[in-house]
Amino acid sequence: MVALRGLGSGLQPWCPLDLRLEWVDTVWELDFTETEPLDPSIEAEIIETGLAAFTKLYESLLPFATGEHGSMESIWTFFIENNVSHSTLVALFYHFVQIVHKKNVSVQYREYGLHAAGLYFLLLEVPGSVANQVFHPVMFDKCIQTLKKSWPQESNLNRKRKKEQPKSSQANPGRHRKRGKPPRREDIEMDEIIEEQEDENICFSARDLSQIRNAIFHLLKNFLRLLPKFSLKEKPQCVQNCIEVFVSLTNFEPVLHECHVTQARALNQAKYIPELAYYGLYLLCSPIHGEGDKVISCVFHQMLSVILMLEVGEGSHRAPLAVTSQVINCRNQAVQFISALVDELKESIFPVVRILLQHICAKVVDKSEYRTFAAQSLVQLLSKLPCGEYAMFIAWLYKYSRSSKIPHRVFTLDVVLALLELPEREVDNTLSLEHQKFLKHKFLVQEIMFDRCLDKAPTVRSKALSSFAHCLELTVTSASESILELLINSPTFSVIESHPGTLLRNSSAFSYQRQTSNRSEPSGEINIDSSGETVGSGERCVMAMLRRRIRDEKTNVRKSALQVLVSILKHCDVSGMKEDLWILQDQCRDPAVSVRKQALQSLTELLMAQPRCVQIQKAWLRGVVPVVMDCESTVQEKALEFLDQLLLQNIRHHSHFHSGDDSQVLAWALLTLLTTESQELSRYLNKAFHIWSKKEKFSPTFINNVISHTGTEHSAPAWMLLSKIAGSSPRLDYSRIIQSWEKISSQQNPNSNTLGHILCVIGHIAKHLPKSTRDKVTDAVKCKLNGFQWSLEVISSAVDALQRLCRASAETPAEEQELLTQVCGDVLSTCEHRLSNIVLKENGTGNMDEDLLVKYIFTLGDIAQLCPARVEKRIFLLIQSVLASSADADHSPSSQGSSEAPASQPPPQVRGSVMPSVIRAHAIITLGKLCLQHEDLAKKSIPALVRELEVCEDVAVRNNVIIVMCDLCIRYTIMVDKYIPNISMCLKDSDPFIRKQTLILLTNLLQEEFVKWKGSLFFRFVSTLIDSHPDIASFGEFCLAHLLLKRNPVMFFQHFIECIFHFNNYEKHEKYNKFPQSEREKRLFSLKGKSNKERRMKIYKFLLEHFTDEQRFNITSKICLSILACFADGILPLDLDASELLSDTFEVLSSKEIKLLAMRSKPDKDLLMEEDDMALANVVMQEAQKKLISQVQKRNFIENIIPIIISLKTVLEKNKIPALRELMHYLREVMQDYRDELKDFFAVDKQLASELEYDMKKYQEQLVQEQELAKHADVAGTAGGAEVAPVAQVALCLETVPVPAGQENPAMSPAVSQPCTPRASAGHVAVSSPTPETGPLQRLLPKARPMSLSTIAILNSVKKAVESKSRHRSRSLGVLPFTLNSGSPEKTCSQVSSYSLEQESNGEIEHVTKRAISTPEKSISDVTFGAGVSYIGTPRTPSSAKEKIEGRSQGNDILCLSLPDKPPPQPQQWNVRSPARNKDTPACSRRSLRKTPLKTAN
């Protein structure tokens, strides 16, 4: 009774006397949707005491809900007895709950709504509520939604606004009136705008937010107390709403401790709303709320957004959340919750978990960070599944990895990486063998990751390769046995690919057999590599795959492939993998900056992993050191960083050196290699040390550390290092250096390298030495030079040191030169004297020492540069005498024009002696040094050097002549300029070394502009692109595209037209190809003829590839005006030479390289994986640009180019020029690209349009015929000796070409001397050589008349048709050249229609009655011999094959036979007339259609 009395007191505010029952009934009738608001006075009465009315009623109802009052007291009886309607209570609760769902609600009303919802839940908790119909699904859902709606939105929390008293929710009573129809969208949007404006005045303090949060917490706790008691099994929509609200609350606030949501605990132990939310989700999963796994499926579906870090809410599209620590924690809690459910529910939940995992894969955000977290979540959940379920999912993942969607294939790799970080599962023997393989890491690497390395999408290939590299790194830390076995230890499979110098281990790291799961499955997935390799069968080789990927067109793929390669090499013995080391060092010069950086990084990592491997040390030096000259500063800095890290930073004092320190040992090993096998890298090191010296990198401590090694086993590298840094660091221990000099110079056979470095150091410190010491060293050096005891390398260093010593001893330049003349004059005199004894005395060469003579000549050249005043003519004569050869008289100067012949003659005194080539080679260098100082000598010597270049057979001599000539070109530019053609001829030298040397030297001269692009030089230079040596061709491409083109961007464009004339050796144009050339030049550089067409096209395409779009646009117009128009207008004659030229021209115009980049490039959608707004904007810009350019290009093409093409076509047809074939091919492409524009263009001349359409149809038929003949070329003849011998392979041509004069027998022409192809033999008909069996054939096919393609085709088709029906053939059977004519009466039998060919291709040739060949068929009405008579059996207009056959069957056949004793009629010119044109109408001039071009270039 106490409880009932308290209930009555609590109900007092909720039972107003003036409450209209109609309002309550309306609320229930409208299902708690919209109704008129509550009377304000009644609302004021309830909330008069604030929350007291809510809390007092709650306290009164609670004992009845919890059962504390006992079983005797019933609340429902009390309601009836006291005339209290529970419907009224629910309606009043609804009023306050509904207010919360509005936007402009104050803190107080939010609290009222939350408490009202709590009262409704409490009333539902009271036993008997269902029977008394307290529950209403809409009211229930609105109370649940209050948990979300009552909390202010983020926009409200973040606004800064003035705090004002919030407006009453009753401000607009009429707004919630029932509406008869749905509101219009405009009204809703206006309402939202008004509400937002009203909402501007609301502000929430921290205290306000705390009150709202506490109210939500208590309401949620009350609701969770209801859930175990109140079944929602029959209320699926309510369950769904509960799940959505609970999931949204999991992200309500951070949970500062680990949340155990499934533990049985009292609700009052929970402290955070997310804890309660997860507990609510757990309660919903109990059987009381639904059977089976329906509820769990709904829960997981909502949890998916939390796991994928997406916004939680309604709608299919959910934006990704910013990746913050709170979002990550929420994801972790969601995964923990699902894991706990799996642990508890076991098998019953496995199917739902598998669906969840698949949905994670399908809906993950395609951004790197989101994919990584999603993969981690997936793997954590997957680890909870038993082996059977795990294997089933991996099987599904394998199929998912072959999805057609790129993001799916990328995410698979993230999942595989995460799986590989876990320990491998033990084999479950209960599984089938088919499923056991899915448990192994080997399957993940082999079947999924490796396959994606061959994916057709570059982003997937790159991701797979980087994953592969990461996988290899995992083997070091986690020691995964399966991966180690896969990459290192498995000896079970054989090597499938080997390369010279490469040892591929017999391990699955390099070759392994694919385990196919089900070959009968349809392969609809993406499984084709970009290189065309089919993925999915056969053996695979990791190293072979990597080599392909390192050459991939995409930068990121190459970069990732390098990472994988280095990861493998780190764990391998590289002794047999030289090719892979070469690949690594070559990638340091990749075109892409990021790849070069990665290659530097990878090589350094490999060297650090195996610091004592000499091969890796050499590869590192060859790869890293040259990059200090890189044009990209960031790459150069990276190379300098690695050099500093490995070379300089590890140099300690010798007393601190010990062999166990890998870093110190490595540093000195690298320096030693730089002084021995890798000396050629010294020039790059000079650049590095120059940069370091500017940064004051070399401290006194560092220098002393280096000096401490000079007397040790590291002496040579230490002196090399000192020679590099001495110039920038004068503070050296001079006494130590002089002591070392005295010690080593007194040795009989000192180390040349070390001695040279010491002399270099002495030269740098000369100005700091005492005068006495300096003079002493000077005398010693001079003495050694006079003694000729040192090697050539030391002589150069000694001369340099001598110059520096004299400079240090002198105070003025004049004094320095005087001192040099005095010191060096003695050495010069000694050289002169020794040479005179050998060269000028009789029998002087008989007992000469070649090595000494070389030293005399070499020393003379170096010393003479320091004292030019002491060099006399006698010395010139001596060097010229050494160069003279007795064979000179046998050679005549090459014809270079009359003006150059005298200059090529050597002076008379340079004849008569014979010297070995090594001496003559050194003499050339010395002569060049002398010429640099003496211009008169240069004038006399240059012609002789040029002649030596042409007649000398020794490679060393020719090489040195080129070097000298190019040096003299810098000193005497004008003098040498006229001999540049002679130098450029060396680009076709027989020796590859000379060709490459010439290429390098000419490139240097062109870069510095000592040589200009004039005459034949450009064409000589580009001919290196087709050099037989691939390295030279590649280097030529580099020089042209990356060095010379950058200095002169229009160079290729300016020379392109002349290239076409020049390489076809066409000299009839008044402007092009008019520079002088000797016959030898023409012979060496000739690319004329069909056999060289492919090489010419390679040059053209290379030039076009490096055009800008503007240049491509202009070159098309320029080609038409400068080449095609000249032939169309009759300015240039149309002959066979012109045919080759035009053939090249049309092939150029048809090539893809001449198409604008903006037109042929497609946006690389593979690169737009991560929703990059900037990338999408660029794609839109590209499309707009492409559309604009297309319009301009089409206009230019239609107005300026098409008229020329049409006019030229007519001329080619008239003259029967073979290039018509290429023109038709080009025209076909044009008609495909500009179909609509051409229709507009030909609208004014329908006759011309009809003719062109007819010609294109005929050309298409010819192409079909060619394909047919190519297929049946081997069955053209018949079997048996008595039958006709087969006609030789028929050249597939568009036209008949007369045999050139003097070529009587076409069988002996070059076109027939080898098997013909359509490309190689166009324009000729090849007939087999005469044999006894071909008598009739020879009579019917005269030698001087090759047949056209159509004639041959008809002969073959008719012959096969007759033979197919004839069993008994006469031995005199011949191939009869008869035709079924379909032309006008004026046409002769040589003019052929495609009638019989069309019949043959359709299989519709009519059968002929058996008869002798000489007997006319009974239906033939006339037989004629050899006359130009034809029987018209086909329509006058082009028609289908069926119509032609019908016309054919209605008439009688005519058989036209050539009279054996009468010569055949001469072939008429082939001219296809349009059916739409009258035969008497003269051909109109198409040139009148051509307009002035939009723009032409020079």
From Swiss-Prot:
Chief location: nucleus
Phosphothreonine modified-residue sites: T1331, T1379
One GO CC annotation: pericentric heterochromatin
Bias-annotated ranges (Low complexity): 889-903
Disease: Microcephaly 22, primary, autosomal recessive: A form of microcephaly, a disease defined as a head circumference more than 3 standard deviations below the age, sex and ethnically matched mean. Brain weight is markedly reduced and the cerebral cortex is disproportionately small.
HEAT repeats: 441-475, 537-572, 579-610, 973-1009
Residue ranges of coiled coil: 1219-1275
Signal peptide range in chain numbering: none
Biased composition (Basic residues): 1487-1498
Region (Disordered): 155-188, 514-533, 889-911, 1306-1339, 1429-1498
Name assigned to this protein: Condensin-2 complex subunit D3
Lineage of origin: Eukaryota, Metazoa, Chordata, Craniata, Vertebrata
Phosphoserine sites (modified residues): S567, S1329, S1348, S1357, S1372, S1382, S1384
UniProt cross-references to Gene3D superfamilies, sorted A to Z: Leucine-rich Repeat Variant
Complex formation: Component of the condensin-2 complex, which contains the SMC2 and SMC4 heterodimer, and 3 non SMC subunits that probably regulate the complex: NCAPH2, NCAPD3 and NCAPG2. Interacts with BRD4 (isoform B), leading to insulate chromatin from DNA damage response pathway.
Location(s), subcellular: Nucleus
Function: Regulatory subunit of the condensin-2 complex, a complex which establishes mitotic chromosome architecture and is involved in physical rigidity of the chromatid axis. May promote the resolution of double-strand DNA catenanes (intertwines) between sister chromatids. Condensin-mediated compaction likely increases tension in catenated sister chromatids, providing directionality for type II topoisomerase-mediated strand exchanges toward chromatid decatenation. Specifically required for decatenation of centromeric ultrafine DNA bridges during anaphase.
Organism of provenance: Homo sapiens
